[in-house]
């Protein structure tokens, strides 16, 4: 059984026990979160596709950790002018473990 849900403008395909990195959620470590925007649920041959969401379905998860991702370097370079600009960015994330899918 797996489900596709939406969080932070992205869609995630998960099943029970998966650990997923999402955009940062303002939640404490160890707390429980429910995602109501479930787009699809597949249970063997039984497929439920939402229009746009499956009514009454939710994905339940537990917050494992909060953190920052790998550094992405941004470089702007102008030729022949000894001019360059360098910047780095680390995106915040929330790591959650899927504890249940309810249809």
UniProtKB/Swiss-Prot annotation:
<comment type="subunit">
    <text>Part of the 50S ribosomal subunit. Contacts protein L20.</text>
</comment>
<dbReference type="Pfam" id="PF00829">
    <property type="entry name" value="Ribosomal_L21p"/>
</dbReference>
<comment type="similarity">
    <text>Belongs to the bacterial ribosomal protein bL21 family.</text>
</comment>
<dbReference type="InterPro" id="IPR001787">
    <property type="entry name" value="Ribosomal_bL21"/>
</dbReference>
<dbReference type="GO" id="GO:1990904">
    <property type="term" value="C:ribonucleoprotein complex"/>
</dbReference>
<dbReference type="GO" id="GO:0005840">
    <property type="term" value="C:ribosome"/>
</dbReference>
<dbReference type="GO" id="GO:0006412">
    <property type="term" value="P:translation"/>
</dbReference>
<dbReference type="GO" id="GO:0019843">
    <property type="term" value="F:rRNA binding"/>
</dbReference>
<keyword id="KW-0694">RNA-binding</keyword>
<keyword id="KW-0689">Ribosomal protein</keyword>
<comment type="function">
    <text>This protein binds to 23S rRNA in the presence of protein L20.</text>
</comment>
<keyword id="KW-0687">Ribonucleoprotein</keyword>
<dbReference type="InterPro" id="IPR036164">
    <property type="entry name" value="bL21-like_sf"/>
</dbReference>
<dbReference type="InterPro" id="IPR028909">
    <property type="entry name" value="bL21-like"/>
</dbReference>
<dbReference type="GO" id="GO:0005737">
    <property type="term" value="C:cytoplasm"/>
</dbReference>
<keyword id="KW-0699">rRNA-binding</keyword>
<protein>
    <recommendedName>
        <fullName>Large ribosomal subunit protein bL21</fullName>
    </recommendedName>
</protein>
<dbReference type="GO" id="GO:0003735">
    <property type="term" value="F:structural constituent of ribosome"/>
</dbReference>
<dbReference type="InterPro" id="IPR018258">
    <property type="entry name" value="Ribosomal_bL21_CS"/>
</dbReference>
């Amino acid at each position: 059984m797996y489900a596709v849900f939406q969080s932070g403008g992205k869609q995630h395909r998960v099943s029970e026990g998966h650990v997923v990195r999402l955009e940062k959620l303002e939640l404490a470590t160890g707390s429980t979160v429910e995602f109501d925007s479930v787009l699809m649920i597949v249970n063997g041959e039984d497929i439920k596709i939402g229009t746009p969401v499956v009514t009454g379905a939710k994905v339940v998860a537990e917050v494992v950790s909060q953190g920052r991702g790998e550094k992405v370097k941004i470089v702007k370079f102008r030729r022949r002018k000894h001019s360059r600009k360098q910047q780095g960015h680390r995106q915040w994330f929330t790591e959650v473990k899927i504890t249940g899918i309810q249809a």
